[in-house]
Amino acid sequence: MWQRFALIGLLVLAASCSENTPAEPLEKVLSSQNPKIKNVMENLEEHEIQIRYTQIDRSNDSIIFTDYDFQVDENNYFYPASTVKFPAAVAALEKLNAIDSLSINTPFFVEGDSVKTTFGKAISEIFAVSDNAANNRLLEFLGQDDLNKRMQERGVSPIRIAHRLSTDNADDVTTKPLVFYLNDSTISLSQPIINSPIKPLDLNGIQKGKGFIADENYQEGPFNFSLKNYYPITAQNALLKRIIFPEAFPKEQRFNISDHQRDYLLTAMHTLPSDIGYDENEFYDSYVKFFMFGDNTEPMPEHIKIYNKVGYAYGTLTDCAYIQDTKNHLEFMLTATILVNDNHIFNDNTYEYEEIGIPFLAQLGRELYEIELRR
């Protein structure tokens, strides 16, 4: 259940904690008497929690990662929801970097779609408010096979992105053409991409619950996630490390994106919704920042920046974040998921996000932040 791993430069050291090991940070935090954590831990089996907390230390030119895990297991399935938008954004930037005629500022639209956008705007919308349509446009540009291959080639695995989000024909294996505006008078049309058929996943917990809603009708029996996206904690953490600290990895594990593209991505990851024009009353600072601040709508302190991507759907909340405090000179990573579906019925939009899930993740972030302040 409890595991600790250290990554020093390019060397990985792994060791499991024994009963005689002093209490590790996650063990201490998850033993908290705060009801936001305690109530979840008292019903642990219900919530399918997985957590990876990464301490970050610097030694000369080396970045040292020390990972602490709680119940992290690639074979135990959880639905990743919108966290899959992070790899889509990275893969899209890498593909753009290889095409001389395109950039993040290139206007385009998907054939059959009335919205004209740019790649940069789509990426900003993905991180600021977790826009599903923006993600789907990037997936039409990439195709599922190309996205998955790019991740796997850089060591971000296991991963299986199979479908779009919240749209008709989400699992269509053929992408739609994109129309690009290359200058004021020239347009270019991309060709549809035919992707591999989706194969069912064979993982623990791939069928969940006692019933589900389909076509507005209740269906008895577990909900089958075997054809859904798969993006476990280990892969999420691996991608975050490679984007925040590319220098800690060999060249073949770094994404081929330009410095300008990476700067744009990092800015998008920590930008607050109001900073790019969204109504701050509806899209408050912590709208998509679950750790530390997710359980309140107050403005976030300016000295704390959270580079992250959240996901929430089917009762599953996930956040993958790099948290930086510029005033106190601390930094750490945290990736966690929790299931909050008390009635065990899926797709009914009756989940305990606000009552249990977000408060748990917020308090988890706060307690680990306090540990970072003291170490």
Annotate each predicted stretch with a short phrase.
Residues 22-33, 46-47, 114-253:
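Active-site-adjacent helix/loop patches that line small-molecule binding or acyl-intermediate pockets
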Residues 2-8:
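Sec-dependent signal peptide recognition
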Residues 18-38, 218-233, 237-375:
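Structured C-terminal helix/loop/strand segments within mature extracytoplasmic catalytic/sensor domains
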Residues 85-92, 126, 151, 236, ...:
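Residue-level preference for non-acidic, small/hydrophobic
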Residues 33-72, 334-336:
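A short, well-structured edge-of-sheet supersecondary motif
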Residues 13-16:
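C-terminal motif of bacterial Sec signal peptides marking the signal peptidase cleavage site
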Residues 78-103, 334:
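Active-site SXXK
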Residues 94-121:
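Short, well-structured active-site flanking segments
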